[in-house]
A protein has these predicted regions:
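Residue register of alpha-helical TPR repeats
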Residues: 12, 19, 60-63, 83, ...
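Amphipathic alpha-helical segments of tetratricopeptide repeats
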Residues: 1-8, 42-53, 86-97, 135-139
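Residue at a conserved register position within TPR or TPR-like alpha-solenoid repeats
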Residues: 28, 65, 72, 110, ...
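TPR-repeat structural position
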Residues: 34, 78, 123-124
Length: 167
């Protein structure tokens, strides 16, 4: 907010600033600080709005939406949570090519949505499909990498995944 007040956030660096906010929000969510993480993610979306960025077409904003969905998943607000995940997944689905960090974010959104779906009656199968997609995206991310899980330029949060998922 201090950078914003000082006029240091420009359209040219807006994506990078919003990604840093996403990283900070992800870290706070990992530390179970939902309110603080949510406030930071909300601010990232406010910056998008202020800069005239269409969040339905911007990959950084879709990452923010997916993380906000994870907050609502923890707060047991399934309907709003589903809307956020679907909105985020729609942006990822439209993108023809992705960088490894984008694949990782896409995988996180698929994983979060799968966790929501397996909690609902008669949607478990779809949840399993999204979990499979999340796993496939992680494997795609590691193609041509020197090791199984290459570092990304985004915040690495492997403990947010359910690695023991049986499929």
């Amino acid at each position: 907010e201090q950078m914003d007040a000082a006029g240091e956030i420009k359209k040219a660096n807006s994506d990078a600033v919003r990604q840093c906010l996403n990283n900070a929000g992800a870290y706070l969510l990992f530390r179970e600080k939902k309110e603080e993480g949510g406030a930071i993610l909300k601010y990232a979306l406010q910056l998008s709005d202020r800069d005239g960025i269409n969040i339905n077409e911007n990959i950084t904003s879709s990452n923010t939406l997916g993380m906000m969905g994870s907050i609502l998943l923890k707060e047991d607000q399934p309907v709003t949570c589903e809307g956020l995940y679907l909105q985020a997944l729609e942006v990822f689905d439209k993108k023809k090519t992705m960088t490894r960090p984008e694949l990782f974010d896409y995988s996180k959104a698929c994983d979060g949505y799968s966790q929501l779906l397996v909690k609902w009656d008669k949607r478990e199968r779809l949840g399993e499909q999204y979990q499979q997609k999340a796993s496939e995206l992680l494997m795609k991310m590691s193609e041509n990498a020197d090791w199984m899980f290459p570092l990304t330029s985004r915040f690495w949060t492997p403990t947010l995944f359910k690695w023991d998922f049986a499929y």
